Amino acid sequence: MLLGRRLAAMTELLKSVDYEVFGTVQGVCFRMYTEGEAKKRGLVGWVKNTSKGTVTGQVQGPEEKVDAMKSWLSKVGSPSSRIDRADFSNEKTISKLEYSDFSIRY
């Protein structure tokens, strides 16, 4: 049973996607909540504020977890945020993770 799970994990597709979230997403702890949600899901990557009032970043991990995080970024966010839309780009399958954890960039 354990061996089967380990084999499944080894063959699991890894995905990478860049994102930008628009709306009231700065000054509402959006980056902190994004970091917490990504870590809870076992994802790696980064998040940061932009000069144009959006939040941008990259997330990597197993395909279904990345897809769930995309949904969270599009619909949930931090409690005080108001998400107008989330744009996703450069979505691709990767052979290995490029980061060791998820971090807030400044």
Curated annotation (Swiss-Prot):
One Pfam match: Acylphosphatase
Active site positions: R31, N49
GO molecular function: acylphosphatase activity; identical protein binding
Residue ranges of every copy of the Acylphosphatase-like domain listed in the record: 16-106
Catalysed reactions listed for this entry: an acyl phosphate + H2O = a carboxylate + phosphate + H(+)
EC number, as in UniProt: 3.6.1.7
Keywords: Hydrolase, Phosphoprotein
GO cellular component terms, semicolon-separated: mitochondrion
InterPro entries linked: Acylphosphatase (IPR020456), Acylphosphatase-like_dom (IPR001792), Acylphosphatase-like_dom_sf (IPR036046), Acylphosphatase_CS (IPR017968)
Top EC group: hydrolase
Modified residues (Phosphoserine): S100
Homology family: Belongs to the acylphosphatase family.
Name under which the protein is recorded: Acylphosphatase-2
